């Protein structure tokens, strides 16, 4: 299999240096958007410009997401492991920070489910070892959990 660069077809081929990339579903519609900072040097000064690329592609595919919120009692969402049991293999993600140069992602996980219309469970394992599981969670929406969930 080969990969082809089609970024110019989608309007994401930038001529200048783009140093930070963050993905997030900015409008909560289940389609992940892209934020990019463009860096330009103009003589003796530097300029940064934020570009927001909204995902407006229509899709009948399903998804599920989780938004993790820090609490004073529960600590940080950073390091949490999120597992979605949906069919023959688990979908797993970890909340991290700093995985893109000069950028930080929100404490949000988004999982594409394709044509699957059901999820068996969604589990969050916090960095301190606590966990919380939602059995049969609703799809095509975000589930909000605080770090003190699972006490």
Annotate the PLM regions.
Residues 2, 8-17, 31-151:
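Gly/Ser/Thr/Pro-enriched helix-cap/hinge segments flanking short amphipathic alpha-helices
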Residues 18-22:
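Signature of short aromatic-glycine-proline-rich micro-motifs recurring in repeat-based ectodomains
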Residues 23-29:
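Acidic, divalent-cation-chelating loop motifs in proteins
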